[in-house]
Swiss-Prot record:
Chain segment of the transit peptide: 1-70
Subcellular location(s) of the protein: Plastid, Chloroplast, Plastoglobule
Identification of the protein by name: Heme-binding-like protein At3g10130, chloroplastic
Recorded GO CC terms: chloroplast; chloroplast thylakoid membrane; plastoglobule
PANTHER family linked to this entry: HEME-BINDING PROTEIN-RELATED, OS02G0533200 PROTEIN
Primary residence: plastid
Residue ranges crossing the lipid bilayer per the database entry: none
Organism encoding this protein: Arabidopsis thaliana
InterPro entries attached to this UniProt entry: Reg_factor_effector_dom_sf (IPR011256), SOUL_haem-bd (IPR006917)
Source domain of life: Eukaryota
Gene Ontology molecular function, alphabetical: heme binding
Keyword Chloroplast: yes
UniProt keyword annotations, A-Z: Chloroplast, Plastid, Transit peptide
Length: 309
């Protein structure tokens, strides 16, 4: 029989009477995890109860935070829109001027800082200048009425072309505005307008109809989106040489007739160029309606050819 000494009993009683905090730590993987676990859990629970609790967020505070976040986001979007609007407005408010001013009237003319057709001036006189215009694409529509510059017909045609430019096309592409707006008189009963795909043909009812066209942004080349409105046609204008006279003020039928007559008369004395047979004039208007009359730039042009050809 095994004998238990009194000293061993005394040591064991002393251990049991000690406080739980003084018990030796026992690793959970050892044989007596239950006793340690009980003391440890109680200690952890007391610590958790002593930790400060986060204050609850009311529904009103949540709504206010959401409104403030949405307002901040809307403000950021508005700032970007205002910045874009300011940049576009600056193109009209701070216009540029042509370098080829030949008289005092032209010196006051200005044009918006927008893309236009590419050309170079071959030479100029005090009455006109000769330009070589590189190929470009236009969107074109027939104008209602028999005059090219009545307010109703011009406004209706302008709006039709603007809708195409700003997204009324097959891919809903919004394109940048260009300048000038070109108006011309139809010369033939049938006029073929070429594009890579498809080939578009337009027929006019008579020779008294006018067409208005927008110069298309050059970055698209022949890959312009097709218009949804069947009255809008895409045309490529080939390279050509033109004689141009510029004038300010408002465009009227009477003013255009007078400018064309003076240009034809002046070209009769040109030693190198002559007006091509059967061509009609074109009118280019560069400025928005709010431009002061003396700052407007308008042009009448006639296609010409070399007399030696």
């Amino acid at each position: 029989m095994m004998m238990i000494s009194s000293s061993s009993i005394t040591s064991s009683l002393s251990l049991l009477s000690s406080s739980p905090e003084k018990l030796p730590l026992i690793n959970p993987i050892q044989r007596c995890p239950i006793t340690y676990s009980g003391f440890r859990t109680a200690s952890v629970n007391r610590a958790i109860r002593r930790q400060p609790q986060s204050p609850a967020v009311s529904a009103t505070e949540s709504r206010v935070s959401l409104v403030l976040a949405l307002a901040s986001q809307a403000s950021s979007v508005s700032q970007r829109l205002l910045a874009d609007l300011a940049m576009e407005t600056a193109k009209y408010v701070f216009p540029k001027r042509f370098d080829s001013s030949t008289n005092l009237e032209e010196a006051f003319m200005s044009v918006p800082d927008l893309e236009t057709m590419n050309f170079r001036v071959l030479f100029r006189t005090d009455k006109y200048e000769i330009r070589q215009v590189e190929p470009y694409f236009v969107a074109e529509t027939i104008m209602p009425g028999e005059t090219g510059f009545d307010s109703y017909g011009a406004s209706k045609s302008f709006n039709v072309l603007a809708e195409y430019l700003f997204g009324k096309n097959t891919i809903k592409e919004k394109m940048e505005m260009t300048t000038p707006v070109v108006t011309r008189k139809v010369q033939s009963v049938g006029e073929k307008m070429e594009m890579t795909t498809p080939v578009i043909t337009s027929k006019a009812k008579d020779q008294n109809q006018w067409r208005m066209s927008f110069v298309m942004p050059s970055k698209y080349g022949s890959n312009l989106p097709l218009p949804k409105d069947p009255s809008v046609k895409i045309q490529q204008v080939p390279r050509k040489i033109v004689a141009v006279v510029a004038f300010s003020g408002y465009v009227t039928d009477e003013e255009i007739e007078r400018r064309e007559r003076e240009l034809r008369r002046a070209l009769q004395n040109d030693k190198k160029f002559r007006v091509r047979d059967g061509v009609s004039f074109e009118v280019a208007q560069y400025n928005p309606p709010f431009t002061l009359p003396f700052m407007r730039r308008n042009e009448v042009s006639l296609e010409v050819e070399n007399k030696e050809d």
